[in-house]
């Protein structure tokens, strides 16, 4: 028996309860969580009013164009703080599971694994960037504004790990537990949240700019990688750490035109080749899984083992 997937009880374990939880969290995110961004947009509109009849003035691109990138990043990350807080509360109320049980099925978080995931994935990503920079330095524009970068660093290091961990909590944690309880299959538990994770990111600006197919493949690969290590490790701490450093580097080290994280990162890539990036991501993911499998002596046979059905609710 494993802890993470098999800590689920029969308390409100049907699929529609999970759908309701996600719906409530999204509603909270788009109301309470959107307050900072709403205030920023109203302030911007007061300073630079646009006629209500100008429909184009209310496009996302137009609205975001005048917003300070650090303020936008902070307001975006705040919405995930709200989502995570509401999710923890609702899951406990509906299913009786604590936030630590959603993470690994126990009452304690294995923080050492969080930092191992962060370190290993971080080294791979920095190494990949270094190779790209050395082979084509002219493709990168170095930008360093000390004051703005200090604020970016503070916002990134305090809020991006929450944003990233929130996504892991929902997909590799909560939804994975739900799928496992419905299907009893670890393979479906790997695939379904990975597909949903990719679809969630389909509205990102990268998809419009670089193509649906290749970007969905990138997102699906990330979801699959983080899902696989979570199944093998019986918890999502490694994925939380890896996802956190992935987005931290995307915020602080390198950005590009069309990125969902529009920040004053140290470097801006002039040209992005999504097909090449997908190939590099495949290699990085294989190496990442291999290193972790060596460290933790994982047994891949567990992927075909059935998940026990939800246990009865104790009165």
Where are the predicted features?
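Hydrophobic/aromatic residues in alpha-helical transmembrane segments
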Residues: 32, 86, 127, 175, ...
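Transmembrane helix-loop-helix hairpins at the membrane interface
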Residues: 153-314
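N-terminal, membrane-interfacial amphipathic/helix-forming hydrophobic leader that caps
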Residues: 1-98, 264-315
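Membrane-helix interfacial "entry" motifs
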Residues: 10, 14, 18, 64-72, ...
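Juxtamembrane helix-loop-helix connectors linking adjacent transmembrane helices
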Residues: 61-68, 74-77, 99-166, 176-177, ...
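C-terminal TM-helix exit segments that contain a strictly Trp-centered aromatic cap at the helix terminus
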Residues: 33-40, 127-132, 249-255
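Hydrophobic alpha-helical transmembrane segments of multi-pass integral membrane proteins
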Residues: 79-90, 118-128, 191-195
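Residue-level signature of transmembrane alpha-helical entry/exit and packing/kink sites
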Residues: 14-18, 22, 68, 72-76, ...
């Amino acid at each position: 028996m494993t802890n993470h997937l098999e800590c689920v009880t029969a308390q409100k374990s049907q699929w529609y309860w999970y759908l309701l939880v996600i719906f409530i969290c999204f509603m909270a995110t788009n109301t309470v969580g959107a307050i900072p961004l709403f205030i920023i947009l109203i302030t911007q509109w007061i300073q630079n009013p646009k006629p209500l009849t100008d429909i184009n003035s209310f496009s996302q691109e137009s609205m975001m164009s005048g917003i300070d990138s650090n303020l936008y990043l902070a307001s975006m990350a705040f919405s995930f703080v709200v989502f995570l807080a509401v999710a923890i509360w609702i899951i406990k109320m509906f299913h009786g599971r604590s936030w630590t049980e959603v993470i690994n099925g126990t009452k304690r978080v294995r923080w050492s694994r969080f930092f191992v995931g962060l370190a290993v994935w971080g080294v791979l990503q920095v190494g990949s960037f270094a190779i790209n920079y050395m082979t084509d330095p002219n493709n990168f524009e170095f930008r360093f504004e000390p004051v703005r970068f200090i604020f970016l660093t503070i916002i990134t290091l305090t809020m991006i790990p929450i944003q990233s961990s929130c996504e892991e909590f929902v997909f590799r944690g909560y939804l994975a537990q739900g799928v496992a309880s419905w299907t009893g299959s670890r393979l479906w538990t790997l695939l379904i949240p990975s597909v949903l994770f990719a679809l969630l990111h389909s509205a990102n600006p990268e998809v419009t700019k670089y193509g649906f197919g290749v970007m969905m493949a990138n997102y699906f690969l990330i979801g699959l990688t983080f899902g696989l290590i979570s199944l093998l490790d019986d918890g999502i701490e490694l994925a939380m750490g890896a996802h956190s450093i992935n987005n931290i580097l995307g915020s602080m080290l390198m950005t590009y035109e069309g990125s969902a994280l529009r920040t004053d990162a140290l470097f801006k890539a002039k040209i992005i080749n999504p097909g090449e990036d997908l190939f590099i991501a495949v290699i990085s993911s294989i190496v990442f899984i291999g290193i972790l499998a060596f460290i933790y002596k994982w047994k891949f046979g567990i992927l075909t083992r059935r998940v026990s059905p939800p246990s009865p609710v104790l009165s």
